[in-house]
Amino acid sequence: MRRHNFSYSKCSLFLLAINLLFACKKEENTTNFDNNKVNLVIADNFNLSVFNAALRVSNMDKELQKGEGPYTLLAPSDNAFGKAGYPTVVSMLSERAAIVSNIANYHILDGKYELNKLPFLFNQELKTRRGKVYATHWVKGADTVLTLNGARILTQNLPASNGLIQVLDRVMTPYVHDKIVDAINADASISIFARAIKRTGILSEKTNQGAYTVFAPNNAAMTLLGFQSVQDVELANLDDLKKLVRYHILHDRRFVYDYILSTGNTNMSKQTMLDGNSVDIKLVPNTSSPGSFSGITLRGLGNTNDVLLQKQDILTGDGVLHIVDQGLRLTQ
């Protein structure tokens, strides 16, 4: 009888030991789970819900959770995604996976980038998982401003256990074309100006050295300049055509926000173009945020009305393309 009781006691102790072992392992697993990884910080922020959806669709959330990093996430706000055509989480979840993957990976840097520690310079090149981005660190009045591809950083250096998060006011688009001339040729709305570029050879392989910014007149604007079709471009005087084209190009990479940062208290500045002549740049006040600016207008030496940007900040491997609603005129 005593041996029977002893057997029961041994059995009970064994089961107790097993339960304690599993309890310890469960507690250990719970303790080791890191809920402060960059993807989980994103998931906990209600203002970054669409970007969180992009990470999930692209499976980048799993990689960021497993990875030691460090990573820097360039997270557009929900408002930024709304402006880019993704107003809700559902709209992102219903997008094609390949497009979402491009968006997500273009907003991820391998490494820890405290952008506020960059030199005070314009358009410093950084490499994301889907291509280059250009960071500007500058002082405007009393504010120190950070931008990426012309998108302003709203909140910087949000900490996570395996990296940092920078919150942007705009979704950045991965560039498709290495050459700005290819981006011009690909847009049907500027096909007449594209033919002028081709005929003059100004952005050809031989002449295209360094970065360029192009303010390309749309087809309606080219019509007002006397070019109703590509045939008119072919028949035009070549020297006159070169003057026209050069007055729409500058030798530098310039996003719209670069002008906002570099323009002084008068809210007006001048931009020297490829032909040596200048274009007036005027800042457009942001009516919903007094003291800030929403964009720019241009005016050539011969323009009597402001030239407006229809599309802006189209990044290529060697420059930036903007599309304008009027041609820049040298004379009236």
Which residue stretches match the model-derived regions?
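Mature, structured domains of secreted/extracytosolic soluble proteins
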Residues: 2-6, 11, 24-332
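Processing junctions and N-termini across compartments
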Residues: 17-18
